């Protein structure tokens, strides 16, 4: 079987980028040939797939930065809503050329295309006689809601998809309604974490301080600024704590972040090179925090659990559903009630102070548990392993 994978972004650094490469990596266990179409820039040299058809942004194919499904990306990006007709035309032309090349040269039996948006619609038109599966990452639903005119103009062919894979059951009705797609052809596939990268430490070092970790976008919609405020309150009560913030700090955000961090000596900010590096970092931390206002799934919280960390997260429906009763009712994860959310991912300003207090209180609970017993019980680690990519890939393979 010959499988072509398609993504309009970098195959790293975002949830969908990591999902994309994890699917490819997982399918290597089966007797398949694989090729990929994705966005890149001149600084990258990817070697994760046998055959690749790259679209180079800020380079030979397209002059402007990669267009991101989220308005805030962990790398330099263009917003769909800000694209001119000329930009859209050059973007479509570059991807169309690669799609046609892949069709003629690689001749796939199946195409897996990520995000229910413009590129997937093009895939449906170009691969009319090939089985095509679309993967919904939820940011595509958000784009469709925020840019309905763009959706109506450029996203017309998703009805041709053989199946749509959803990351949680909670978005199935939304997919069916927004894209007018038959609900019986939508499969709740969920996600999985890469157990080869995210696994617990063999033994835990004894540290004086409890180490708290955040990794992701430095963005309002992630509750990022409220997290810093919460930690500043926490460290006034407990001096034996540290917070590490992993991500890309953009120049325009630096003054605000530095102002909030203030004179704290217990907050470190840096970036991870890749997923392997992130996995190594996680194994030396104690608690992972995900204070986000919007997530399709929040896979990074699952990766943290797989790495043996306790987790504090907001009440993300997809995550709660995904982890299941046994993990949710254990003491290794605690959920924090969000402030009222409007416009998909914005928190009501007046409710943020109470949310910050809730973050502090929940972190205090987890810190106490960590000090009492750092290691996660074996039976819970085994339960978490049920959500690994190994299990998920078997399900995806059966759908091809």
Q: Which functions belong to the PLM regions below?
A:
Residues 15, 347-361, 365-398:
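A charged, aromatic-enriched C-terminal amphipathic alpha-helix characteristic of glycosyltransferases
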Residues 41-102:
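A conserved catalytic-core segment of Leloir-type glycosyltransferases
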Residues 18, 210, 219-233:
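A conserved mid-protein helix/loop that constitutes part of the nucleotide-sugar donor-binding site
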Residues 255-276:
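Nucleotide-activated donor-binding/catalytic signature segment of Leloir-type glycosyltransferases, i.e.
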Residues 215, 242-255, 271:
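Glycosyltransferase donor-sugar binding loop
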Residues 144-146, 184-185, 193-209:
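Acidic anion/phosphate-binding donor-loop and adjacent secondary structure
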